[in-house]
Amino acid sequence: MKIHDFKIKKQEQKKISMLTCYDYPSACIVAESNIDCVLVGDSVAMAVHGYPTTIMATIEMMELHTQAVARGLGKQFLITDLPFLGHKSSQGHTVENVKRLLQAGAQAVKIEGADKDTCQTISHLVNAGIPVMGHIGLTPQSIHQLGGYKIQGKNSEQAETLLQQATTLEQAGCFAVVIECVPQDLAKTITDSLVIPTIGIGAGPGTDGQVLVWHDMLGLQTSFNPKFVKKYFRAKDHFIEALNSYVQQVQQMHFPANEHSF
């Protein structure tokens, strides 16, 4: 998938599939699938490193995981999250952070929020030739300001703000916008108001595409079960079964067998 395909898919009403990915083996699997695009999300801080929030993701962490994923991917378009405060200190600092991610293999960056400074930064990056994906609704990097993980845009004032944010991000030059944890009717309204595509997570079926976290949709963990996640596989159960089978065969001296020995 190329950058221009995002808008083409919206025009042709073809849904966009996006999935997070954090390491080389997983990227190699994704490369053989029909997934359109991959996000090296700052959710790696939680899903892989065990931190309680995405705030703990650093530019070094994002750079390392981007390098690993880029080495394994094939035709999929690769986007990397700019981590917490990665675009807040100065434009020069932001450009340097983005440069590191692009040199690591990202083809675009995703930036959370739509305040005036953020939109100016996005516009600056786009004018420099860097593709930027926006992100509105529940923005995990602002989780303390939002008062926790909860649905955004539930009243008319919040809904109008989100609609304006989406429009502002489009005007700033974003090629797509993620809408997270927003009522489906509002997400559909935002989607219909934009020329650029929307990618939803917890935003209903009316967006131009969907994104899920690798570990969530494959059932690699069972402690986090938000309503918007569908588990397409029960990987954790199968992994535990395989591990216990290995232990049993070692104890019973069924492994290694002759075919595993020299």
Swiss-Prot record:
Which species is this UniProt entry from? Legionella pneumophila (strain Lens)
Q: What class of enzyme is it?
A: transferase
Q: Which reaction does it catalyse?
A: 3-methyl-2-oxobutanoate + (6R)-5,10-methylene-5,6,7,8-tetrahydrofolate + H2O = 2-dehydropantoate + (6S)-5,6,7,8-tetrahydrofolate
Q: Kindly state what the record says about how the cofactor is bound.
A: Binds 1 Mg(2+) ion per subunit.
Q: Which cofactor does it need?
A: Mg(2+)
Query: Localized where?
Result: Cytoplasm
Alphabetical keyword list:
Cytoplasm, Magnesium, Metal-binding, Pantothenate biosynthesis, Transferase
Q: What protein is this chain from?
A: 3-methyl-2-oxobutanoate hydroxymethyltransferase
Molecular function via GO: 3-methyl-2-oxobutanoate hydroxymethyltransferase activity; magnesium ion binding
Any one GO CC term of the record: cytoplasm
User: So where does Mg(2+) get bound?
Assistant: D42, D81, E112
Q: Mind telling me which InterPro entries this protein's record contains?
A: Pantoate_hydroxy_MeTrfase (IPR003700), Pyrv/PenolPyrv_kinase-like_dom (IPR015813), Pyrv_kinase-like_dom_sf (IPR040442)
State the source organism's domain of life. Bacteria
Which of this chain's residues are annotated to bind 3-methyl-2-oxobutanoate? Answer: D42, S43, D81, K110
- Database matches in HAMAP family: PanB (MF_00156)
SUPFAM superfamilies from the UniProt entry: Phosphoenolpyruvate/pyruvate domain
Q: What does this protein do?
A: Catalyzes the reversible reaction in which hydroxymethyl group from 5,10-methylenetetrahydrofolate is transferred onto alpha-ketoisovalerate to form ketopantoate.
Cystine links in this protein are none
Query: One Pfam match, by short name?
Result: Pantoate_transf
Q: What is the lineage of its organism?
A: Bacteria, Pseudomonadati, Pseudomonadota, Gammaproteobacteria, Legionellales
